[in-house]
Amino acid sequence: MAIEPKVIEAFIEIPTGSQNKYEYDKERGVFKLDRVLFSPMFYPAEYGYIENTLALDGDPLDVLVIVSNPTFPGCVIDAKVLGFLNMIDGGEEDQKLIAVPTEDPRFKDVNSLNDLPKHKLDEIAHFFKTYKDLEGKKTEVGAYEDAEAAAKLIDECFARYKG
């Protein structure tokens, strides 16, 4: 029996369709342009993180929220976590949560990665496999894991943050 997806607040840094990589500077309370992607690619979903978490790469836990329309940097989205994509980036483990907004009726019946079009998951994996190629950096993309594994990962990252 499948578990109910965990609902989180996703703090969005980069809207769907952007080539700009923004990062939130907590000390200054502003969004800073970290870089523009070297490749003619764009973020395939809203990209951000869960506050008060600490992933294995030393940053807050990353989340992609698949939306009908782009939002904006600083938007907070209540989202159902469907699973995550395993990656290696810069030699470090890096997981990308995959989620959908709770407040969009188009995603009402989406409760697992299997409810998404396979092509969307392929787009996300392809993006993260190739988006740093022209920078001369390599990333490795692994398998997707389900909502139950994602819930465990989220709990671990909250606990790691609390130290």
Swiss-Prot record:
It comes from the Bacteria. The keyword DNA repair does not apply. Mg(2+) 2 binds at residue 62. Substrate binds at residues 21, 35, 47, 131. Mg(2+) 1 binds at residues 57, 62, 94. Its EC number is 3.6.1.1. GO terms for cellular component: cytoplasm. InterPro entries: Pyrophosphatase, Pyrophosphatase_sf. It is found in: Cytoplasm. GO terms for biological process: phosphate-containing compound metabolic process. One of its GO terms (molecular function) is inorganic diphosphate phosphatase activity. Its cofactor is Mg(2+). Keywords: Cytoplasm, Hydrolase, Magnesium, Metal-binding. It catalyses: diphosphate + H2O = 2 phosphate + H(+). Its main location: cytoplasm. It holds the Pfam family Pyrophosphatase. Homohexamer. Catalyzes the hydrolysis of inorganic pyrophosphate (PPi) forming two phosphate ions. Belongs to the PPase family. This is Inorganic pyrophosphatase. It comes from Halalkalibacterium halodurans (strain ATCC BAA-125 / DSM 18197 / FERM 7344 / JCM 9153 / C-125) (Bacillus halodurans).
